[in-house]
Amino acid sequence: SECLVGSEMCIRDRHSWGNNHKQIADLPNELLRKAKVQGFSDFQVARAIGYEGDMEDGILYVRKHRKEAGILPVVKQIDTLAAEYPAQTNYLYLTYSGVANDVHYLGDHKSIVVLGSGAYRIGSSVEFDWCGVQALNTIRKEGWRSVMINYNPETVSTDYDMCDRLYFDELTFERVMDILELENPHGVIVSTGGQIPNNLALRLDAQNINILGTSAKSIDNAEDREKFSAMLDRIGVDQPRWRELTSMDDIQEFVEEVGFPVLVRPSYVLSGAAMNVCSNQEELERFLKLAANVSKKHPVVVSQFIEHAKEVEMDAVAQNGEIVAYAISEHIEFAGVHSGDATIQFPPQKLYVETVRRIKRISREIAKALNISGPFNIQYLAKDNDIKVIEC
């Protein structure tokens, strides 16, 4: 730990002044190499030199500088035999503590990379792992080389018999780009791994990576709450009233408009973590004080919560915006319980025929508006044939 602190202090001492880009360009190669060997990410290097611009730009500048300096990771095989015998496996990881790759790269665009779901909590990971494994099986069946990037040892997708190459490494932009530049694949599948791969889609697309299936722009239009809400308004689909708020006064004003209960969600959380239904003022204040730091940097999404509504899910696959297969399932609990924790029955047992018909129609409209090609999930609130979209 003293070495890490020493490297960071050295970077800061040398580069706590001047133009951001010049700071990165003047970073000594030996110091940068030492930082990478000790585990500093490009983000941490940019932060250590005091980069003041958009941090995503800072990461790209650091990346460009180290690539020009020849500071690149190498690929090593994980020794599954503890050095008892020479091990030849496709179980791989990247490191800066090496001089040559353990595997040979063809660079023939004949591989397809699947991004896994990473470390997920109990109740919301098995479906992503199943999707990833099915994608790997299909890739092989179609005659392509299958490549998986994931770091959860408890999943089937990280069994190195499942694919031609398994990178047991982190699902960050930096590491994924390092692997993609080595593999030079035909394309990348982000749609089977859940939130973490989806968050990388736009940044990978900006680097001219071929995203297979639904485009990065369409993924962003579904993931970005404001863009998705505007799209629903444009196609005439109902949704619960909501706002992204940055102060207690704004939250109080919105609650007075819609009344209790309200659903409160801090920004940038995975799998519905830290969501809470607040039924009165005391619960709202306690939750915001304990679980959410409300500010312009950390806005909170507050939604109208409809009591005694049923939550219904549409899981489907579309091609060029047209649904080709679907399944509608029904939550036994009332809305407000996360899908990963809820008890779900399929086929649905207690839905009105009109409710099912409307859900199908709305799903077709959303798939067409987003031009979806691949799997997707839409969550609905249903009460007395009144259908509202929660998210896609």
Q: Can you say where each PLM-predicted feature lies in the sequence?
A:
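Single conserved hydrophobic/aromatic residue that forms the stacking wall/gate
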Residues: 1-13
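N-terminal beta-alpha lobe that positions the nucleotide/phosphoryl donor
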Residues: 17-34, 40-60, 68-378, 382-392
